[in-house]
Structure formats: structure tokens, C-alpha cells
Amino acid sequence: MAKKSMVVKSSKKQKFPVREYTRCERCGRPHSVYRKFKLCRICFRELAYKGQIPGVRKASW
């Protein structure tokens, strides 16, 4: 889990757009966040396995 202070800090409007970065909306993790879903890889995997993300299914080939 991310520090609450860092989550609040990243949610504020930055003076320069370069300083903005994505965070997982579920846990607040700053790295490995999928922009389309706004989730980190760990939360994405959990929700995908549960079937809570529409249109996402496990790949098999």
C-alpha cells in the first residue's frame, strides 16, 4: 500500500504537467500502472481473474 501522503500529493494539480504521474486508483502504487484501466499490474491481475473487468480474459494459445 502506498503512503497516504504520497497519494494525496500526486492527486493535486501540479504546476508543470511533466511532474504528474499515474497511480493505481485501487492501492495507490506508482509503478506499472495501465493507463487504460488506471490499475497497477497486481490489482489488474486480481480483478481480471475474478472477472470484474469487462472484456478482459486470460490468454491461451
From Swiss-Prot:
One of its GO terms (molecular function) is structural constituent of ribosome. The keyword Cell inner membrane does not apply. Keywords: Metal-binding, Ribonucleoprotein, Ribosomal protein, RNA-binding, rRNA-binding, Zinc. The keyword Zinc applies. One of its GO terms (cellular component) is small ribosomal subunit. It comes from the Bacteria. GO terms for biological process: translation. Transmembrane segments: none annotated. Coiled coil: none annotated. Belongs to the universal ribosomal protein uS14 family. Zinc-binding uS14 subfamily. Part of the 30S ribosomal subunit. Contacts proteins S3 and S10. This is Small ribosomal subunit protein uS14.
